[in-house]
Amino acid sequence: MDQSMIALALFIILLVLLYKWSVAKYDVFSERGVSHEKPWPLIGNIPLKAMIGGMPVLKKMIELHTKHTGSPVYGIYALRDAVFFVRDPELIKLIGIKEFDHFVNHNSMHNNIQESILSKSLISLRDGRWKEMRNILTPAFTGSKMRIMYDLIQSCSEEGVIHIQEQLELSQDASIELEMKDYFTRFANDVIATVAFGISINSFRRKDNEFFRIGQAMSRISAWSVVKAMLYALFPRLMKVLRIQVLDTKNIDYFSSLVTAAMRYRQEHKVVRPDMIHLLMEAKQQRLADLSDKSKDELYYSEFTADDLLAQCLLFFFAGFEIISSSLCFLTHELCLNPTVQDRLYEEIISVHEELKGQPLTYDKLTKMKYLDMVVLEALRKWPPSISTDRECRQDIDLFDENGQKLFSARKGDVLQIPIFSLHHDPENFEDPEFFNPERFADGHALESRVYMPFGVGPRNCIGNRMALMELKSIVYQLLLNFKLLPAKRTSRDLLNDIRGHGLKPKNGFWLKFEARQ
């Protein structure tokens, strides 16, 4: 047998082994009687079009959810791994709240692709360490602490209004068109810079400032970063050995230096600024006090280090930079396409403005605006910041409904996805879900729904939801007080079909027309 035949035989053997390895886990759903999609070798049920941004992902999520109507759980294979999607409201409540101790953690695969510093962030921590960090951070997000930081956010909102006013003055027309993803990313950037990192930046004036530029680079999902994440999922040990990073360490070092310098300056000069660094420094000092108390359980209490503090700042950055900007894009998009809603909201805003008699809007006034609250809640229903959240089962458990009927048997290591976006667009949960209707929140009924969860579910929901709501309401109040929001020529009329790929953005962007109110 010549060398070419040997090489061909080895190649065929390698292909067979690769095939067998790629499909080795594809019997999980069949063995457990779970409704599922037929997988392709290696890629599972993740279409290549979705990977390269050629598919309306949100629309496909709804279609998949609808296809499995009647099943409390359905499954797909993400590459080689089985993922259980939970669509039954009672089962979601069991997993997220009642039996939370069995489902404390997010998918452990997340930790495989986390850089060392981000592995210390609240979203990545597991078990007792997560609970400890959550308890440390919770006091920093109370209503009283939000009230302290409100002025910083309000200042950023006012700068955003000034920018549009200046653009209108420069325009030859009575209106201007803006791409809102860029606009709200700059707003979110300035809020995060001042609230989480203690620095004031006006990204509307200094368009290419370093903080904004590096933030854009870190939040941008490139094809190579997707490939690296997939390789981490397939070959976690190899990727760790090769020390391949998903994020650029130079960018992380930049933010690390900002936090370290801010902490050192404040400690040396006894500076107090009402922002996240100050609140986290307070939490750090409280932790040191707890550690010095010998009556505490020393095995439970661990030190809150500078790296822990930095990790939380980075987490706030990622959450604020992308999630807030996207949520504001969707919210203002709905307002421009629903003029009746916008007009009614403007009536409430102008009424509050007149009550203030020239005084600045306060946090308490903002939080008591009922219709503004309804509009924001409905926008978060239709376009939730997190399209899905996950839990990993810690130990085997049978889950039963209130009548004693078994809903699902979860096994240790199972990854359970709660498809928030699909649940919010399910007519069984919300009547006429594609219709933007703030009135569904008029009596609080929709808010109490077991499947309304824009910020997650249970004890592991988003700790910063109060701050997120404050940001959304603050900038929307200022924009509608000063401008009419109208559809532009490039405004998408079919977002579900136009949003493709990994980012929640239509292919042509979010375009709005602004007219100054008289």
From Swiss-Prot:
What Gene3D superfamilies does the record point to? Cytochrome P450
Keyword entries, A-Z: Endoplasmic reticulum, Heme, Iron, Membrane, Metal-binding, Microsome, Monooxygenase, Oxidoreductase
Its Enzyme Commission number(s) read 1.14.-.-
Q: Name one GO cellular component term.
A: endoplasmic reticulum membrane
Q: Which InterPro entries match?
A: Cyt_P450, Cyt_P450_CS, Cyt_P450_E_grp-I, Cyt_P450_sf, Insect_CytP450_Detox
Write out the annotated subcellular location.
Answer: Endoplasmic reticulum membrane; Microsome membrane
Q: Which GO terms describe its molecular function?
A: heme binding; iron ion binding; monooxygenase activity; oxidoreductase activity, acting on paired donors, with incorporation or reduction of molecular oxygen
Q: Which Pfam families match?
A: p450 (PF00067)
Membrane-topology annotation of the record: Peripheral membrane protein
Biological function: May be involved in the metabolism of insect hormones and in the breakdown of synthetic insecticides.
What the record says about family reads: Belongs to the cytochrome P450 family.
The protein in question is named Probable cytochrome P450 9h1
Gene label:
Cyp9h1
